[in-house]
């Protein structure tokens, strides 16, 4: 099915290619990640008024006080989750579906993606968008992301797209042995972090300084 904002569909492939080239120059090296981002039309995940800026390396506002992360952040977090291809990503949990762009990228690198969003109307719009794009290996859930999705079993990768001061134990318990979690951590100062589940326990590594909206508890229905 063809889905596009009027006036930019013919240039979207060219601008995606340029975006991928820029990401490569900025240090994103995983060709699987770059191919996924080159395939997913980012302009379909932003508001129509901002569609002309969709391929700029900036975060853009979406509805309900949320943002779509910059392409570099999406590439960086996805590359970290894949860990150079050493992490077999059969099943991923994403906490914070938002507009669904990161979700769609994850769906290109994993067999199954489970994604949780606390804002009901935002999730409804995202569900329609992903269905129109024919992305069928995503399971969306309207719920409080702080508890994860224990009923779905263990995950090879977990990604959180909002900042949190500390990871709850309940989320660590959902990370499979050998799995990796990628998330922003902090308060006023925020850092991109990874947690690897190893035979010696959970090992945390602090990486880049970043800026994300905070994770919030509970759900919103309207």
UniProtKB/Swiss-Prot annotation:
List, alphabetically, the InterPro entries matched. Answer: PCMT (IPR000682), SAM-dependent_MTases_sf (IPR029063)
Keywords annotated in UniProt: Cytoplasm, Methyltransferase, S-adenosyl-L-methionine, Transferase
Task: List the active-site residues.
Answer: 69
Instruction: Name the catalysed reactions.
Output: [protein]-L-isoaspartate + S-adenosyl-L-methionine = [protein]-L-isoaspartate alpha-methyl ester + S-adenosyl-L-homocysteine
Q: Which Gene3D superfamilies match?
A: Vaccinia Virus protein VP39
Q: Which family does it belong to?
A: Belongs to the methyltransferase superfamily. L-isoaspartyl/D-aspartyl protein methyltransferase family.
Q: Can you say what this protein is called?
A: Protein-L-isoaspartate O-methyltransferase
Q: Which organism is it from?
A: Nitrosomonas europaea (strain ATCC 19718 / CIP 103999 / KCTC 2705 / NBRC 14298)
Phylogenetic placement of the source organism = Bacteria, Pseudomonadati, Pseudomonadota, Betaproteobacteria, Nitrosomonadales
| Gene from which this protein is expressed | pcm
């Amino acid at each position: 099915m063809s889905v596009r904002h009027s006036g930019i569909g013919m240039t979207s492939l060219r601008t995606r290619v340029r975006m991928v080239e820029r990401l490569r120059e900025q240090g994103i090296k995983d060709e699987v990640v770059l191919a996924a981002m080159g395939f997913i039309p980012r302009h379909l995940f932003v508001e129509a008024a901002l569609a002309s800026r969709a391929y700029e390396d900036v975060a853009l506002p979406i509805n309900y006080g949320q943002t779509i992360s910059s392409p570099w952040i999406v590439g960086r977090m996805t590359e970290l989750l894949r860990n150079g291809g050493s992490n077999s990503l059969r099943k991923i949990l994403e906490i914070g579906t938002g507009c669904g762009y990161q979700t769609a990228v994850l769906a290109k690198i994993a067999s199954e993606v489970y994604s949780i969003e606390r804002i009901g109307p935002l999730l409804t719009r995202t569900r329609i968008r992903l269905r129109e794009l024919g992305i069928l290996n995503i399971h969306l859930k309207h719920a409080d992301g702080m508890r994860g999705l224990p009923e779905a079993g263990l995950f090879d990768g977990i990604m959180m797209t909002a900042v949190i001061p500390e990871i709850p134990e309940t989320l660590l318990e959902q990370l499979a042995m050998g799995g990796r979690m990628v998330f922003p951590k902090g308060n006023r100062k925020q850092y991109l972090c990874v947690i690897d589940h190893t035979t010696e326990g959970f090992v945390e590594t602090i990486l880049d300084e970043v800026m994300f909206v905070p994770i919030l508890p509970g759900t919103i229905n309207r």
